[in-house]
C-alpha cells in the first residue's frame, strides 16, 4: 500500500527549508508551495493523502468528486480548526495532527516577547540605527521604560505542553507563576490553579496558551482587560480569536496596559486594515509578529518527522495522532 500512495502537499512553503525527500522516496508526491481556495479541489483530485498546514478543507470539498479517492488528511500542525473533522469522520477519511512538536519553540518565543516588552531591546536598537545615540547629550539613552522580571508575577492561561515550558523558563527569571483554571470553572482547579479572574487581577504579565474554542473566543475582552493590573503586559502566542482586538487597542491607547505582544491574529495573513496591524504602526506599546513562534528549525523538522510517522502508521493500518 505504501508504494502506491499518492500524496499532495498543499502549502509546503509553510515548512520552510525542511526537506521532503523521505516522502518522495517512498510515495508519489505532488508538492505545491501555496494553494488558493479555488485551487484546492483540482489538487486534491485523485490523491490518497493530503498534507496541509493551514489550507481549509471543508464539507463542500469533501463532498465533491475531487475527494472521492481521499483516505487521509495529514495536518502538519497541532490545531485542526481548518479541517471539518465531523465531515471527514462521516466519510471515513482519517485525520491526524501533530501535537506538541513546537512547545519548546513557542515557549522560547513567548519569553522573548516578554523580555522585549520588559526591556525594549528592539526599540533601542532602532534608535541606534536612526542615529539617536550619537546625538545624545549623555552617555546613554533612556527613551523607554524597562523593568526587571524578578519578583513579578506571570499568569499563564492554558497549562499544556507550552504553558508548562513557559512556566519553567519564567521561574529562571525569578517570576512567580500563577496558573489559571479552565475558563468557566469555579474555585481552585487541579495543581492549585486559580480562577481566571484572580489570575488576571494578580498578574503583572498574562500569557495565553489555550486553544480557541467557542468557550475561549474573545476570552480577553473589555471586562477581562479591566480586571488586569494597571501597567500589566499581555502576551498572545496562541490564537488570535482569544483576544478582542478593539478592546485591547483601547486599553493600550489609554495606557491601562503597559504593553502587549501578539504573534497571532484572527486573519492570517492579515489585510492592511486589520485593527492590530494598523495599531502596531501607531502605538509603541504594541508588538505584532507574523505567527512565527512555532517556526524554529528544530520544530519544523520535528513536525515533518511526525507527519511522516503518521502516514507510515496509516499504511500499516494503525492509528497515530488520530483526531477523526
Positions of predicted regions on the chain:
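Short, Asp-centered acidic motifs that coordinate Mg2+ and/or phosphate
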Residues: 48-49, 72, 205, 233, ...
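An N-terminal-biased, well-structured beta-alpha scaffold segment characteristic
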Residues: 1-96, 201, 221, 227
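N-terminal Rossmann-fold NAD(P) dinucleotide-binding loop
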Residues: 163-164
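Phosphate-binding beta-alpha-beta segment of Rossmann-like dinucleotide-binding domains, i.e.
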Residues: 99-153, 168
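Rossmann-like adenosine-cofactor binding region
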Residues: 57-63, 176-178, 182-275
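Glycine-rich Rossmann-fold phosphate-binding loop(s) that bind the pyrophosphate
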Residues: 12, 159-160
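Short, conserved active-site loop motifs that form the nucleotide-linked donor/cofactor pocket
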Residues: 27, 93, 191, 285-287
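Rossmann-like dinucleotide-binding domain for NAD(H)/NADP(H)
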Residues: 95, 231-233, 237-324
